[in-house]
Amino acid sequence: MYLEPRPGIAWPSLPLRELKGAGKIVVDTTNQFAAANPWRGRYDVGDLTGSEWVAERLPGARIVKAFNTLFAAFIAGDPRHEEGRQAVFYAGDDADAKAAVAALLDEFGFAALDLGGLREGGRLM
């Protein structure tokens, strides 16, 4: 499993050769921002969601989008609180890959919430 911790502005530098094929699970944490400041625009990926765009560039890899709705400080801290566990949304088109990511989120202490496939869930995130 590969967790992609870069911002969307780093998409061009994804290690494509290492991540293609072989059924590797890639956790896409990015957003479509063209700059660190989201008010400066988004990458134009046409009708695709950002994760669908990433999936097209990584044939054979199993993409699961997660962590992109949280600031780093919320990910780094303990997600278990007196009020309950912090939620992390995830989405993907491969059921086994999603199950693996959900298990990892649970192990980290997060409450994992499945938003469906990359198309539907990606648009919600």
Protein language model features and the residues they cover:
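Glycine-rich, phosphate-binding/catalytic loops in enzymes
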Residues: 18-20, 43-45, 107
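Glycine- and other small-residue-rich loops at beta-strand/loop junctions that grip anionic moieties
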Residues: 3, 43, 90
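Alpha-helix N-cap/helix-start capping motif
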Residues: 7-8, 48, 94-95
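Internal alpha-helical scaffold of NAD(P)-dependent oxidoreductase catalytic cores
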Residues: 56-63, 69, 81-123
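Glycine-/Pro-rich loop/turn segments that contact NAD(P) or position catalytic residues
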Residues: 27-84, 102
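Rossmann-like NAD(P)-binding element
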Residues: 1-25, 30-38
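A short beta-to-alpha transition loop/helix N-cap that caps and shapes the active-site region
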Residues: 36, 123-124
